[in-house]
Amino acid sequence: MEEFQGYLELDKYQQHDFLYPLIFREYIYALAYDHGLNRSILLDNVGYENKYSLLIIKRLISRMYKQNNFIISANDSNQNKFLGYNKNLYSQMISEGFAVIVEIPFSLRLVSSLEATEIVKSYNLRSIHSIFPFLEDKFSHLNYVSDVLIPYPIHLEILVQTLRYWVKDPSSLHLLRLFLHEYYNLNSLITPNKFIFSKSNPRLFLLLYNSHVCEYESILLFIRNQSSHLRLTSSGIFFERIHFYEKRKYPGEEVFSNDFPSAILWFFKDPFMHYVRYQGKSILASKDSALLMNKWKYYLVNLWQCHSYVWSQPGRICINQLSKHSIYFLGYFSSMRPNLSVVRSQMLENSFIMDNAMKKFDTLVPIIPLIRSLAKVKFCNTLGHPISKSAWADSSDFDIIDRFVRICRNLSHYYSGSSRKKSLYRIKYILRLSCVKTLARKHKSTVRTFLKRLGSKLLEEFFTEEQQILSLIFPRASYTLKKFYRGRIWYLDIFCINDLANHE
């Protein structure tokens, strides 16, 4: 954010919280163009970069106020190549640019909070894989876990109202409301969950959804911190502190005192409650009894319904013992597997044999959902038998091999933290054989004949990818290399879940 602060002239607009002047700045859409839109698609339009000007942006925005906006006729498509490529291209540009503008207050608050608390920025914590070492370290001491699907708003106006607390610019909010009303059908009674996380325009909707979730999570964090701080306080003093909270003017405390009875705070005196969220799913885990977990569950439901105005069914939130339940999270099946070890102790003439039971965090590759994902994109059938990718048969041999290798490399990279590699090897086998069948189909030959003619060098990249990466990490230790190749490795450069791994 520091790189763009001077360029965007934020100091001038930040004084009055005005964001709408930035809508007419060309470099905002250049940033959105670089970050959000597909460069190869846009450059296919003849003369796109020459027509990308402030006049074009103003014309695009003015179309939003017309009666038949967002509808382009065939004549318009022929006259304007910029708008003729895709009917929704200009609306996507406006939404991407608007998302960049609305992100400014959030980014500035984040930078100021980091500077105030003197927190050193750690870019490694952005990685999805950084969550798993936390689970591995904390979950071994916990007993109960609950999978929670975060409810999404049934009306997009709720998202706009939530954003109002962060963005103090009415003009920008009116533009957002108009945009949602005209293009995304604001009056729809039901907003599908997949629509919020869709790839058609993820930046704007992820911003709105995350601001909505951030609001209730801030209240959850406040209650969690206060309940942990007052864990040993007697109930009488505790209720006195509640009345004291009502007199203070913190947003989380006001919401809490207005929406919930004071006695409910007594339920949450648990210092071992852990909360993890990614996209629309969260995990609650605790060391205490199932009764306390059940109270936390109903607290979340009341928080969603009374404050966030979203409906949730308590019966769909299940509480399970961590030792007997697998958690499906971030494309992994995670569980706590008991690891039994026998220890022999000898003291003088007496010897003792003790069974030592320890919990081990186990992460598995979900083979069945992955095969379904591969079958959906035509790499195999529903039974997992490899088939040729007919859509790629017209490409060159190099492009076909490169595509398969990149998919296999990404899956191996993402599932490097698996405790057991057998399922991952099966997925790689499906991709390798599908690649060979695609090449054989292109050359009108059988798989056996094609392999005999080209030999084993054809698929060397499939086999050597992990060894090459690990040889850079452990260049002189062959035993360590083999050990880590079989074990778990968490990478700190994975910023989004793999498409094939996202089965939800």
Swiss-Prot record:
GO BP, one annotated term: RNA splicing
GO cellular component: chloroplast
Name this polypeptide is given: Maturase K
Alphabetical keyword list: Chloroplast, mRNA processing, Plastid, RNA-binding, tRNA processing
Top-level taxon of the source organism: Eukaryota
Function field: Usually encoded in the trnK tRNA gene intron. Probably assists in splicing its own and other chloroplast group II introns.
HAMAP family: MatK
Keyword Cytoplasm: no
Compartments, record wording: Plastid, Chloroplast
UniProt source species: Adenostoma fasciculatum (Chamise)
InterPro entries attached to this UniProt entry: Domain_X, Maturase_MatK, Maturase_MatK_N
PANTHER family assigned: MATURASE K
Family: Belongs to the intron maturase 2 family. MatK subfamily.
Main localization of the protein described in the UniProt heading: plastid
Gene Ontology MF term list: RNA binding
UniProt xrefs under Pfam families: Intron_maturas2 (PF01348), MatK_N (PF01824)
Protein's gene: matK
